Amino acid sequence: MVIIQKSSFNKVILLLIFITTQFFSQEISGTVNDSQGNPLIGANVIIEGTNNGAAADLNGFFTIEFIPLDDFTISVSYIGFKTIKVTYSKNDPITNLQFTLIQGKLFGNEVIVLARKREETIKEVPISMVSIGKETIEDMGATSIEDLTAIVPNVFAYDDQTATGFNIRGITGGARNPGMATAEGVYLDGVIMGRPNFISSDIVDLQSVEFLRGPQGTLFGRNTVSGAINMITVKPSPVNSSAFLIEKGDFGYLKMKGSVNYRITDKIYGRFSGYSFDHDGYLTNTFDNSREKYKNNLGGRFAIRSVSTPKLTLDISYDFLQEDLKDISGHVSDWRISSRSSTFDGKPLDSIMIAIDSTVINDDGIYSYNLDSTGSTKRDLWGVTLNANYKLNENLNLISVFSYRSSLVVWSNDEDHTALDIMTGKWDNLGEQSTFEMRLVSDPNFQLSWLTGVFYYNLYERLIAPVYPKPLFFHIAAGIPMFLAEAQFAGATVEPEGKGNTVSVGAFVSADYTVSEKLTLTAGARYSLDRKHFKYRQDGIPSFGYVNVPSDSNGHLISGYFDSTKTWSAFTPSFNIKYSITPSINLFGTISKGYKSGGFNTDYVSSYESVATPFKPEYITNYELGIKGGNQSNTLFINGALFRMEYIDMQVSQFQDLFEGYSISNAGKATITGLELDFSLRLFNNSLTLIGGFGRNEAIFNEFHDGYFNGYWNEGEEYTDANGNGEYDDDEEFIDMDNDYSGEHISTFPKQSWSLMADFRMPINSKMMFVTQLRSDYIDEKLSQLSTDKDANLLRDDARTLVNGHFGIETESWGVFAWGENLMDTEYIIKQGVNGYLGFIEQLWGQPRLLGIRTTFKF
């Protein structure tokens, strides 16, 4: 009886607890939609710090039973969207809540850019540009700038083993010659990378990458005649977080990246990012059937942000890169060599060697080369940047950027690129750069907004690049009998050394004036002053075209250096007009001018005049008409432009001939016309994103006499036939003429290109998403190199289409993907050219199909 009574009592107590709980508990309910009002099926809604939560149903509706004892926070998340958190008190109404999630990556008109050194939406910027944000970079699985340029019309990057080259609107930047500046400006957090050796193309912890097409001479200044590439890193934040990526693929491919963000104090935050990249490569040296290390990179970045006062933000960063590689070479497509000997000139070297001593020097096809010695390359790069942003008042900010960068590249190489002991070489290139910029920026919300600033740049560079021609070189290249070559030229050396400073200062101003709600005018100007001081000497072999510098009246090398200083200045204005047809569609027009400073030939030189006479600055005027806009729902964005660029004194680096190597000269005039169009489109409730583009260029030398006089007779040059035999003989008088490329296409660019990326995402449940992406890009045929003694068709790269992609599963904290590059296994040429010493043609073929697995983690 007692037991029954206790049982009844317990039941009563449980019933009272249940009734009390139901009485005091509350139902949290509401809906989760995107910014267009579409329900987000499976969105995750949880009460932070508890196990209470729910997933949104087909209508985006959710309910949660919960007893609020104090303030509480609701977290709402969905794959591909920004998580939101809202805190409520226990007395707040918590039924019929409405949560609107924003896409994780800004899209279309919303994209924020720094193209004009202030934050604004991409639609408001009256120039032709593309911005790729952090989320898109991650979605693509992009690990290099080259990956990103595949979806940017009229911008191309060719990332070979040790460096990245760029071509924007048909203009290729720079040369290996330290006396020549680059044509495009590559910037990292507002700091110019003054030489290719300062650039790390591996993508690590980038917030966005902006591609500005056309000259940017007003705000970015010198050496941005083709455009600018603006890389912006992720800044430290007060939220502790970390992220890691591991990629494993064929051919010994292993890439690892990671970043950690830490809140040091309430007002000081720190961030560290690191990466490593190892790749055995896809090219085989048939000499010993080996694969040399194609990539072996280690890099990182430390950053600290201080917000000690509401008015002042300080960002300090240190980044570094270490490369330690084995040199590779290219497949020889045409063994015919250039020689002063009629016995060897125009004959294939492989056949010559079989005839001489039965030596086989051929490789095994396009993915192979044949070197008897393996060189190495080491690069140590580091830099530090200090960025300060001080709010003077509500309407004016003072911004300053200071930086220092240092790069040392040391390599040894098999210069002849064959299995023969013909020539070896070394390269020791040191670069040190310091920059400072200060600018005042007004509030952009006034009818007249403006910015103005000053800029200082100092670059020191030193290059020592000896080559060691062996007796076999003199035998083949000049026909000297082998026993004489061994007696006269054993231990021969050609050793150029160039060093010096480039100092540049500039002042700039730009202003926007809002004439009406629809019309805005922008005008700006910059004054630049460049001073180059170079010292040069070369221990040469005058009888073979490599002169001694400095030398006496007999051509003998003397002590000291050739010393030269030159100063150039330029005024580069710009004018823009922007007209809003609708709130989401703008027309724009641009007239802008670019300037690239002059310089000196400080590579191997064949005459005293070529080093003593600097090449001139180049100037470009850009005319541009474009449109930017999208639909009201912001699921479509289109950016298009027509352009015409007129060049004066375009600088061209080109191969001359066997004993002259590469030389820089000025084309008289060149004209580049074209168009570019890119779009972004979202379909099927944002589950499918399409990004594509089309570009076309027509680039012609209107007038180009390269000014190259080699000092000896070439086929086609006029001469006095003294003995009447109908052919030129030694010691007969001749007219040494330069080469005329007028009417020729500018090399290294494709006339036409297009790209398309399709990204499809489908929720598996409230926490997991299936992702698949395909990317395809097409490049038209192009001429690799201008040459004075080779048929242009031999140096023409065929058109190619590449298909890359990945698929996998991702959550808020991890992801697993299978990925592939060159899925169709297309055979294509990255670059080719004439061997600088023997004249045969080498080709570097692109990566064949590469498959791998990628894993990501976020904490």
Description of each model-found segment:
Residues P238, E247, R263-K347, I354-I356, ...:
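Periplasmic-side early beta-strands and strand-to-turn transitions of outer-membrane beta-barrels
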Residues I304-T309, L440-D443, S449, G453-Y457, ...:
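Structural signature of Gram-negative outer-membrane beta-barrels, strongest in the C-terminal barrel
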Residues T63-E65, P153, N177, E184, ...:
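Short acidic/polar hinge/loop motifs at secondary-structure boundaries
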Residues Y712-N714, N723, E727-D730, Y778-S787, ...:
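C-terminal beta-signal and adjacent terminal beta-strands/loops
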Residues N33-N38, A43-E48, S75-K82, N91-E138:
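Short, acidic, small-residue-rich periplasmic hinge/interaction motif at the N-terminus
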Residues N387-K391, N397-S412, S580, N586-S592, ...:
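Membrane-embedded beta-barrel scaffold of Gram-negative outer-membrane proteins
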Residues T182-A183, R195, V204-R213, T218-G300, ...:
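Outer-membrane beta-barrel translocator/receptor signature
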Residues E517, F637-E646, S665-L786, T856-K858:
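Gram-negative outer-membrane beta-barrel transporters
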